[in-house]
Amino acid sequence: MAILGLGTDIVEISRIEAVISRSGERLARRVLSANEWAIWETHQQPVRFLAKRFAVKEAAAKAFGTGIRNGLAFNQFEVFNDELGKPRLRLWGEALTLAEKLGVTHMHVTLADERHYACATVILESQISAG
């Protein structure tokens, strides 16, 4: 395995709360996938949920080395939890196309939050062919 990219992001949760207060659900609609949106709508802590998703998606965009531009959008990165509760990343659209082009075979996600901050790190790996 070879590391293709590493990205980290930290989000101040109060900043997400301020944006939601000013513009309603517009940020959530821009950031969340359809599956994440369904969870956000009924989540007990929607601001914290959105902040954590935002941190993972920013970290992923940094790991890809692109940021959110050139056809990539936040909602093309979907954060979900596996059967053990571990955060995972699913890609759609241009994000998936880019991952395939780069030869990404595995994505590692770590996510943490405390009272004021949410932090995420994403590592992209590629399988090295013997030769």
UniProtKB/Swiss-Prot annotation:
Catalysis performed (reactions): apo-[ACP] + CoA = holo-[ACP] + adenosine 3',5'-bisphosphate + H(+)
EC number: 2.7.8.7
Subcellular location: Cytoplasm
A single Gene Ontology CC term: cytoplasm
Keyword Transferase attributed: yes
Primary location class: cytoplasm
Example of a GO biological process term: fatty acid biosynthetic process
UniProt KW keywords: Cytoplasm, Fatty acid biosynthesis, Fatty acid metabolism, Lipid biosynthesis, Lipid metabolism, Magnesium, Metal-binding, Transferase
Domain of life: Bacteria
Cofactors (names): Mg(2+)
Alphabetized GO MF terms: holo-[acyl-carrier-protein] synthase activity; magnesium ion binding
Binding positions for Mg(2+) per the UniProt entry: 9, 58
Role of this protein: Transfers the 4'-phosphopantetheine moiety from coenzyme A to a Ser of acyl-carrier-protein.
Protein's name in the database: Holo-[acyl-carrier-protein] synthase
Organism: Salmonella arizonae (strain ATCC BAA-731 / CDC346-86 / RSK2980)
Encoding gene per record: acpS
